[in-house]
Amino acid sequence: MLSRRHFLTSLLTPAIVALAPNLISAQEGVFLDEEEAPRAVFPEGTHFEKKVVPSTEALREKMRGLLGRTRPSIWEDAYVTYLVRRHGERLGFAVIAEEIGKHRPITFVVGIKPNGKVKDVALMVYREAYGGEVRERRFMRQYHDKDLAAPLLPYRDIVNIAGATLSVQSIGRGVKKALVLAQLVLLDGAGRP
Amino acid sequence: MKRLLTLFVVLSVGLTAVGTALGATLDDLERQLQAIQKQIQELKEEKQRQDQKIREMEAAQAAQKEEVKKEAASLREQARRVSSELAERVRIGGYGSVRFEGNSLKEQSNTFTFRRFVLTADAKPADPMQVYMELEFERFTQLELERTTRPQDGGLRVAQAIEGTDGSEISFEQLWFQYDLYPWLKFRTGQVLVPLGRFNINHDDNRWNIARRSLVDRGVPVLPVKSAWPELGAGFLGDIRLGELGKLTYEAYVINGVALDAEVENIAQTRDPRRDKLELEVEFQPSRGTAKLDMKDSKAVATRLAWSPYPGQEIAGSFYYGRYTPQFLSDESIVAFAIDGLTTIGPFEIEAEYVNTHFRNVDRVARSFARVVVDQSANIPSSVSPTFEAEVEFELAGLARNKHGYWIEGRYRFWPEFLTSTVFGKYFENPQLIAIVRGEQVWLNGLVREAEFEGGVLTKLEQENRRLYRVTAGLAYRPTPLVVFQLAYEYTKTDKGRSLAEVTNFLPAQSDEDEAHAILVGVAFGF
């Protein structure tokens, strides 16, 4: 009896240790720095032109108007944005945004196409102890091609992650904020960057 | 002529005298004037000196004020940094829940229940390390100990009184240290939640929409110990990404594990016409393992492996194996396994869990127990004490050859737009109403009903098969993800003519009450 238990115990640990390291992910952490962020959402981009948009009270007021029922938990002092080109062709904008999860801010980058739709979203910094699954590509893929008309809410148009509902809701808020900023400041009237 | 000359002389002398006198006065005046001017100059200089001094003093005061201001600002910054660092390293949270219940039972038809308040703390001693704690106060209102020691009646009198309320419990639901050895391998040790099924590891009340926990996990525990079930041990956990195939999540621990442990109950009873009674009942039942010296020379293993092909979809298998008998009884083990899952399709969710627990050789354990205890009970015969009876009794409880059961819960989330402008919607970003239906069944096969023994020999072991099912339907309102208002109707039924109290740990049914209807209203919150 004892030896069987010992056998089972000793079997489990090495089996787990033997798993390939690059297959496994962590919760908290810094996953992208500011320089890497636009490349994460526009990997095909060749030129990244940084532009800092000050977050003035007038801009916030306009953003509030477009955000409707979505109420940001953070108003950034300024928005770090990148105009992304591939050999001269304009691909879109990358906007760095922040929103509070349960206790702490989540920082992420939103890639926005010239038509005002989401190209991609990538997590830059996750500071919560739980809910780090929002970092996964398969979760972030849900935001592809979403625009301002989308609710971006769990159980509406975004599949929730059990135990991370607040983080899921935060990412949705942040994506909306980035889309609104693009609409007001980055894209021209014809919807071109 | 002479008179004219005389007049001239007199006038000259007079004028000379006057002139001399006048000249002397002007000199004096000039001197005085100079003296005054000098004094004025000195006063001016003195004033300038004083002004300079004042200016210097004012400048010094201003500099001093600036210095104080700077120091205060620096102190404030320091305090802010310290508190921010502390906030970064330690996060306090928690959850709590209360319930009102009205039911059809004869004995107790309605009650408020303080389900629990759990305080959580999450700290990071260093970047790859984490300490997590959940301290639970369940059905808790107070616990007070009074003790007096004093000489009395020619001897020493020590009196002790424990004051508390029924069911009050303080417990560490979790208390562990985690070291992320590599980003892909996390080592955890301490009081960890046993990963058998999905409820135990996701047991926070504010995550669920019905104000009563499931039968297999709590009310008729098929889990070896009712949830929340932590054990002291160590192990590993992590997530394994499989690319397009999704994600695997694993947890694997070696723990002290469940053991038959004694619960000592004191009963004082007045009876008429029988003798009044003072009873000491020692009940041995499967209990959470000790945090001190393990009472068995054997550890248990528990592991869970979950596969999530897509977000919102998960299926998992879990397993528990370990000795459940203390060292002084024959060596017998528990084998338990669970299958659980979650699927999400838009606003619909289905979540389910099946648990199967097998206590090996319950009859052998009963015989072994009889051998060790020798006599099931001992009391003072009425011939010795005609009005008062004292008894000590040993019992085996909570054992069954096999227990198994499941719960399956369907949820539909919606929000009528007309509520958006009301108080239920206008303050919240994503309020939800959730319609819930939960179905549950439990089978208890070979449930030990009575074990009688005398002189170290088991004389009777009565076992029975019992079945119980429950259906719950309700509506929950979630203004935010952390807060839920719960309303549900619940119907519970066991074998015809048999009491629900015999198989559940939450329904005070009488011996003929085999069914119960209940309305549950609850609030659960997290922060």
Give residue spans per PLM region.
Chain B
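Bacterial N-terminal signal peptides that target proteins for export
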Residues: M1-F8
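Surface-exposed loop/turn segments flanking beta-strands in extracellular/periplasmic regions
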Residues: W208-R218, R271-L280, V374-Q376
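Bacterial N-terminal signal peptides
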Residues: F8-A17
